[in-house]
Swiss-Prot record:
It comes from the Bacteria. To chloroplast ycf18. InterPro entries: NblA, NblA_sf. Involved in phycobilisome (PBS) degradation during nutrient deprivation. May mark the PBS for degradation by covalent association with PBS components or may disrupt the PBS via ionic interactions. This is Phycobilisome degradation protein NblA. Induction: Present at very low levels in nutrient-replete cells, and at 50-fold higher levels in nitrogen- or sulfur-deprived cells and to a variable extent (<10-fold) during phosphorus deprivation. Pfam families: NblA.
Length: 59
């Protein structure tokens, strides 16, 4: 059996920010949303690489 996952809940401030973003994307074209999505995925990958590099340096 897998160990329980830590709580990844958003803070109240993060929930508020998420709601603002949700409202903003309603006015964006599908093409622009696709571009933004790809950029978010790219940044997430870069973040993972930074995190992995920090772990390697600490080992």
């Amino acid at each position: 059996m897998l160990p329980p996952l830590p709580d990844f809940s958003l803070s109240v401030e993060q929930q508020f920010d998420l709601q603002k973003y949700r409202q903003q994307v309603r006015d964006i074209s599908r093409e622009d949303l696709e571009d933004l999505f790809i950029e978010v995925v790219r940044q997430k990958m870069a973040h993972e690489n930074i995190f992995k590099g920090m772990i390697r340096q600490g080992s």
